[in-house]
């Protein structure tokens, strides 16, 4: 089967690699550097499984800048373009998705379009009405950055949208796509759910908002424990051994961040509109409160020091361990709060060669020099590289994992 994938981020690329084991897949991107890397068997993103598969597996995979040619020949088109949250309108920016839909429909009269990008509830219905076609369906992704291909190989569930009054072809394509994902997975007995588009859209936003809720819960627990001088580690362990709660997703941090949770929680809150709620809004608020609290704690530690020159060293801007993504990283908001107090910031981030021109922080990518200059070293996730200056480190990473 010929499949086109719009977008080579962690969603699009992981799907492209997965499906190219048994299908002809063409990935479309607008960046020549990404296209060149993929065509040379190199991953443009950090993902151990993607890197290995591109290097070692026989894949029927190519990348191109020629979108029209790729879409024209495809039987299925997967759309995995960004939908960033637009704070000005308090809604997802879906223009990239809509642009691809329009382009595909202009050159292909038979392919079913499968949207993998995260979208607002009701978006598929809106697009079907706008473009007068039922050939647009939704399949939410549940992938972690840096582990996207692994999560496709071992999925928790597969969800594809389909409506009762859809044409036989669209119904067949929805089932076919679900089967493609299931047959490519290494995990057995993966649950497959076919449901309405609005329900599938809701699953995605509510699932990520629950994860954000869990992060916020353990962060607020940790705030209480630190403020009352309780052993946060012991409290969390005592709670998490309850099977109903579980020993997962319970490690305190500076706040949830990354590409999905911040924007998905805000979008769900926007979708509520006039529907009564308090919890969803509280999750978003809790994350902001946590970052402010962390900044205050750093300032308190700094003020206790007698050194005339006080420098905060930020170890890594990445959101998670082994990530290459700085987007919506909680530490960046903490840095902004500290800078508003005229505190000198130095940053160790080996993935950067320079900071943005308006950034008043200083990039120090010699680790030993960084350690010497900093009075306090702040890190969202602890690393053994800091073991020799452990007495300088402020972190709320209790379990040494994400």
UniProtKB/Swiss-Prot annotation:
Enzyme Commission no: 1.1.1.22
Pathway(s) it belongs to: Nucleotide-sugar biosynthesis; UDP-alpha-D-glucuronate biosynthesis; UDP-alpha-D-glucuronate from UDP-alpha-D-glucose: step 1/1
Keyword NAD in annotation: yes
GO biological process, one term: polysaccharide biosynthetic process
The family this protein is said to belong to: Belongs to the UDP-glucose/GDP-mannose dehydrogenase family.
PANTHER family in the record: UDP-GLUCOSE 6-DEHYDROGENASE (PTHR43750:SF2), UDP-GLUCOSE 6-DEHYDROGENASE TUAD (PTHR43750)
UniProt-recorded name of the protein: UDP-glucose 6-dehydrogenase
Organism (species): Streptococcus pyogenes serotype M3 (strain SSI-1)
